[in-house]
Amino acid sequence: MDTWHDALGGEKQQPYFQEILNAVRQERLSGQIIYPPEADVFNAFRLTAFDRVKVVILGQDPYHGVGQAHGLAFSVRQGVRIPPSLLNIYKELETDIEGFSIPAHGCLTAWAEQGILLLNTVLTVRAGQAHSHALLGWERFTDTVIRQLATHRKHLVFMLWGGYAQQKGRLIDSQNHLILTAPHPSPLSAYRGFFGCRHFSQANSYLSQHGIEPINWKL
């Protein structure tokens, strides 16, 4: 199994998946603003090939502010203000990875292109309404993504931040992969253990131990 089509082609033919796409399409047609833009919904899969995934960072649902979401968890486009959770991720990187300095932007495309799957478990959201698409059925699809990676790939690093993401640990065999857990990097919880978790250096150590080129976290 080498491609997302191999892993997910059958899933995309399922009635529930077509129902999700139709529901989102109908909302857009009715004038509701949905993020990310239609062309960006599956960006994470476009930028990170199935057979090149090294690290999976799970988010919840896309940013719901104007111009923020572009299909990669935690990431925003160039020129958009860095959101607080991402700024805290950068702060942890600054203390964890030698030579990392906080960039002036929040675009994580360079990570995605190195094999970091930046996966939101819900792939769309209404403007200004967090979790508004939580019940559309996206999680059935993204659970399959996690399960397929965990089953058909070896020695991946899964970063599960916050209780919501940590629930997905049940889909992953810890004998074959490294599961790293910590509180969410949001300002509400980062000081409860996200800061100091050193997940980024741990990920690189694990990858190196298994003969896999480590991530260059610098942006």
UniProtKB/Swiss-Prot annotation:
Q: Which residues form a coiled coil?
A: none
- Give the Gene3D superfamilies listed for this entry: Uracil-DNA glycosylase-like domain
Localization per Swiss-Prot or TrEMBL: Cytoplasm
Q: Which GO terms describe its molecular function?
A: uracil DNA N-glycosylase activity
Active site location = 61
Query: What catalytic activity does the UniProt entry give for this protein?
Result: Hydrolyzes single-stranded DNA or mismatched double-stranded DNA and polynucleotides, releasing free uracil
Assigned keywords, A-Z: Cytoplasm, DNA damage, DNA repair, Hydrolase
Q: Could you tell me which InterPro entries the record lists for this protein?
A: UDG_fam1, Ura-DNA_Glyclase_AS, Uracil-DNA_glycosylase-like, Uracil-DNA_glycosylase-like_sf
The family database entries (PROSITE patterns) matched by this protein are listed as:
U_DNA_GLYCOSYLASE
Q: What is its EC number?
A: 3.2.2.27
User: Gene Ontology terms, cellular component aspect?
Assistant: cytoplasm
Family the UniProt entry places it in: Belongs to the uracil-DNA glycosylase (UDG) superfamily. UNG family.
What the protein does comes down to:
Excises uracil residues from the DNA which can arise as a result of misincorporation of dUMP residues by DNA polymerase or due to deamination of cytosine.
Q: What is this protein called?
A: Uracil-DNA glycosylase
